[in-house]
């Protein structure tokens, strides 16, 4: 039998400024993983988190 699919899903958040910013501290893109409730948050998440590559707090958006 298949396991029942839960309400919470694991998502990946990616820095929006790492793609376009050329004056970064180090090369690369910052990514975080977290979970969200599928029923309460139907749209894409946007959270302000610390990016070690940009060395500042930036907006991280949900990616596929």
From Swiss-Prot:
What InterPro entries does the database record attribute to this sequence? Ribosomal_bL33, Ribosomal_bL33_CS, Ribosomal_bL33_sf, Ribosomal_zn-bd
Name the GO cellular-component terms: cytoplasm; ribonucleoprotein complex; ribosome
A GO BP entry = translation
SUPFAM superfamilies linked: Zn-binding ribosomal proteins (SSF57829)
- Keywords carried by this UniProt record: Ribonucleoprotein, Ribosomal protein
Question: Where on the tree of life does the source sit, at the highest rank?
Answer: Bacteria
Q: Which Cys-Cys disulfides exist here?
A: none
Output the Gene Ontology terms for molecular function: structural constituent of ribosome
Q: Which Gene3D superfamilies match?
A: Ribosomal protein L33
| A UniProt-annotated Pfam family | Ribosomal_L33
Which PROSITE patterns has this protein been placed in? RIBOSOMAL_L33
Q: By its UniProt entry, which NCBIfam families does this protein fall under?
A: PRK00504.1, PRK00595.1, rpmG_bact
Q: Which PANTHER family match?
A: 50S RIBOSOMAL PROTEIN L33, CHLOROPLASTIC, LARGE RIBOSOMAL SUBUNIT PROTEIN BL33C
Family to which the UniProt record says this protein belongs: Belongs to the bacterial ribosomal protein bL33 family.
Instruction: List the protein's name.
Output: Large ribosomal subunit protein bL33
Protein source organism: Rippkaea orientalis (strain PCC 8801 / RF-1) (Cyanothece sp. (strain PCC 8801))
Q: What is the lineage of its organism?
A: Bacteria, Bacillati, Cyanobacteriota, Cyanophyceae, Oscillatoriophycideae
């Amino acid at each position: 039998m298949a396991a029942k699919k839960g309400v919470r899903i694991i998502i990946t958040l990616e820095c929006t400024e790492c793609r376009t910013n050329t004056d970064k501290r180090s090369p690369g893109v910052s990514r975080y993983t977290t979970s969200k409730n599928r029923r309460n948050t139907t749209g894409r998440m946007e959270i302000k988190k610390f990016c070690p590559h940009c060395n500042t707090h930036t907006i991280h958006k949900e990616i596929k």
